[in-house]
Amino acid sequence: MPATAPIDAVMQALAVPTRRAVFERIVRSGEITVVELTRGSGVTQGAISQHLKSLKLAGLVVERPEGRNAYYRARPEGLEPLADWMGHYGAFWRDRFADLRTLLKEIDP
């Protein structure tokens, strides 16, 4: 089986709405346990664990075991492949906004 490119792994991990919500909650919390993630989520602990596994494999979170608990925190550098990919389109958007600015000035000098 061919290795997944980092951008593919990140996009696949964040493509699932529940997984995105888990990731966002980790980001907001700084560091959080599976039990805390499960509480109030409407998702089983087993499902949360599977989502965490996908996020870890994509390099988006890291796990820190402490006693009987495992604490999860986001890895901001895990989003770099996505940011790099999006950066390639920055010129496209800058050009489009420049064209829009020109058009607006022509319409309403």
What are these regions (language model features)?
Residues 105-109:
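Generic C-terminal helix-cap and adjacent flexible tail
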Residues 47:
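Conserved H-loop
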Residues 56-67, 73:
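Beta-hairpin "wing" of winged helix-turn-helix
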Residues 79-103:
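C-terminal structural segments of small proteins and small subunits
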Residues 19, 50-51:
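Histidine-centered divalent metal-coordination motifs
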Residues 2-44, 69-80, 84:
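N-terminal helix-turn-helix DNA-binding core of bacterial DNA-binding proteins
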